[in-house]
């Protein structure tokens, strides 16, 4: 079920994660895996390997992840008395050998969370030493500062929703001064608010992202825009960026040294990029362009068979986010009950509260992105979904 955090709750969690973050760059031959394959020692720090970090480590030393997991979690019997033994030590010995004699880049960045008080670290990621560790706290602080800077133009930013864990963060913000009506919508007084969608991933599964976010006030749902944003000269702006930077300095015991001038400059460059992108995303003409898209979708061809339309949509998502049978049913039920058979109606069903309640927050956010992709489909592509063959 989709459950969002308040601004205060998310900010507190982001602060705690940054305070407890432990980033260590170490040579592979200084890493020691335990015989049960569940902990890893780096310098003076002993930590539990999360499933994600364990998989990243296995892939780096070219050990099949599924095979390593089976060895770690299974046993075998031996001898006349059928004594039981864990397979983990055998696999751990093989991995230890690859760590001691690496065939790839021998330097890795270990990203951990150190709870303190003598408790073990949680190793959450095993990454290249060129990975740029931009913490969610830093990204959020920059975004909120930028929002405060435009308060005199668009009003005080409003918190639409957000969520965070030790791996990723999602934030959706809107401005009361960026409101417009979708005049062709079947819903009377269908007003939207424009703002920002912010996403960050800290464990190598993605990149930071800044997109436009639109909230529909009639039903309090929203969409994440995938529109290409350009500057005044028409050049595409950076709205997402991989976490890659200069090679990080080795500091096995005390972690990455943030005083390094080159790295500090690289971090500031990222912040400047974020600030510039936000400034362009919040221009009123960006909202006007989206309103034109929504009005066109509201006036589009009607679906001749709602169930077939949803099924065809699900087919198109197979190579991206996919849609389970359960999710298709949620979307169809809302599409049917709303009575709006247009392109606009399907997009609203996809990102509706009724659908979101059946999903976790990250999955609901994917559906908000899908909803925008549907509402922005060219007429010919929409017709392939809407019109019966």
Regions found by a protein language model. Give the residues of each.
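Intrinsically disordered, low-complexity regions enriched in serine/threonine
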Residues: 1-90, 161-162, 174-389
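Long, C-terminal folded domains that constitute the functional core of proteins
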Residues: 126, 168-169, 314
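Conserved aromatic-histidine-acidic binding/catalytic patches
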Residues: 45, 123-135, 161
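Amphipathic alpha-helical segments
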Residues: 129-154
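Beta-rich nucleic-acid/ligand-interaction surfaces
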Residues: 152-178
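Extended low-polarity, hydrophobic cluster-rich segments
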Residues: 104-105, 138, 173
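Extended non-catalytic scaffold regions that mediate assembly and binding
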Residues: 76-95, 99, 110-116
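A short, surface-exposed helix-loop junction/capping segment
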Residues: 99-130
């Amino acid at each position: 079920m989709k459950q969002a955090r308040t601004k205060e709750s998310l900010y507190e969690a982001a602060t705690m994660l940054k305070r407890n973050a432990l980033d260590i760059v170490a040579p592979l031959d200084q890493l020691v895996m335990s015989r049960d394959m569940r902990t890893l020692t780096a310098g003076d720090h002993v930590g539990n390997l999360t499933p994600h970090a364990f998989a990243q480590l296995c892939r780096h030393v070219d050990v099949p992840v599924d095979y390593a997991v089976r060895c770690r979690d299974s046993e075998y019997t031996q001898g006349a008395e059928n004594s039981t033994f864990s397979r983990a030590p055998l696999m751990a010995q093989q991995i230890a050998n690859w760590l001691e004699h690496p065939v790839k880049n021998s330097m890795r960045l270990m990203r951990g969370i150190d709870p303190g008080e003598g408790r073990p670290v949680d190793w959450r990621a095993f990454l290249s030493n060129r990975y740029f560790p931009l913490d969610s706290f830093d990204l959020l602080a920059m975004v909120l500062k930028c929002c405060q800077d435009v308060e005199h133009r668009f009003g005080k930013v409003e918190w639409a929703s957000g969520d965070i864990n030790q791996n990723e963060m999602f934030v959706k913000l809107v401005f009361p001064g960026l409101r417009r009506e979708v005049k062709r919508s079947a819903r009377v007084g269908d007003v939207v608010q424009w703002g920002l969608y912010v996403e960050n991933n800290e464990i190598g599964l993605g990149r930071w992202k800044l997109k436009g976010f639109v909230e529909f006030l009639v039903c309090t749902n929203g969409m994440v825009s995938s529109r290409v944003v350009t500057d005044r000269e028409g050049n595409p702006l950076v709205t997402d960026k991989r976490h890659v930077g200069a090679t990080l300095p080795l500091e096995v015991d005390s972690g990455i040294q943030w005083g390094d001038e080159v790295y500090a400059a690289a971090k500031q460059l990222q912040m400047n990029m974020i600030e510039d992108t936000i400034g362009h995303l919040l221009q009123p003409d960006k909202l006007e362009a989206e309103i034109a898209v929504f009005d066109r979708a509201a006036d589009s061809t009607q679906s001749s068979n709602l169930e077939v339309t949803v099924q065809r949509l699900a087919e198109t998502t197979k190579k991206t986010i996919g849609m389970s049978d359960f999710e298709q049913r949620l979307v169809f039920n809302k599409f049917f009950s709303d009575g709006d058979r247009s392109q606009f109606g399907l997009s609203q069903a996809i990102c509706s509260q009724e659908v979101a309640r059946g999903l976790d927050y990250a999955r609901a956010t994917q559906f908000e992105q899908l909803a925008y992709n549907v509402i922005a489909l060219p007429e010919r592509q929409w017709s392939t979904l809407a019109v019966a063959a």
